Amino acid sequence: MTVVIVKPGYAPYEAEINGLHEMQEVVGGTIQAIYPFEDRAAVACNDEGILLGMPYNRSVPGGYGGVFGPFFVCGLGEEDFCSLTAAQIKAYKKEFRCAEILIGATGNTPITMKVQPKAVGSPGQEKSRNDHPGRE
């Protein structure tokens, strides 16, 4: 299925993931789904991200607070997850385009500072936007 993957500190990117094992690899463990959006989409994240000490990732709307560790946004079918539409991919890449640094919280509302994300290169190769060719 086609999803948008969001890693702490990095720009979101489109990817294909298939099956429970790959979903768990993306989030680093047991999956928890939350439904902060008005359209048929979900955030799938690590159920124990904060307990495992995963880094803060992004704020999510709808009173859910923030997500710790990597997550992906996927579509919702009748009974399970499914691919996002092209419009949803564009919308969620825009929604999560800025990385965030957690400064504090008021109740369940995170107080964050939005920062420029690091760019994600080809799969498995993550580069900062400040990396220059020939200086690797």
Q: Where do the language-model regions lie?
A:
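Short, extreme N-terminal segment that most often corresponds to the first beta-strand
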Residues: 1-11, 135-136
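Short, surface-exposed polybasic-aromatic patches that bind anionic ligands, especially phosphate groups
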Residues: 31-33, 45
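Catalytic phosphate/metal-binding cores of nucleic-acid and nucleotide-processing enzymes, i.e., regions
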Residues: 35-38
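Extended coiled-coil/helical scaffolds and adjacent low-complexity linkers that mediate multimerization
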Residues: 82-123
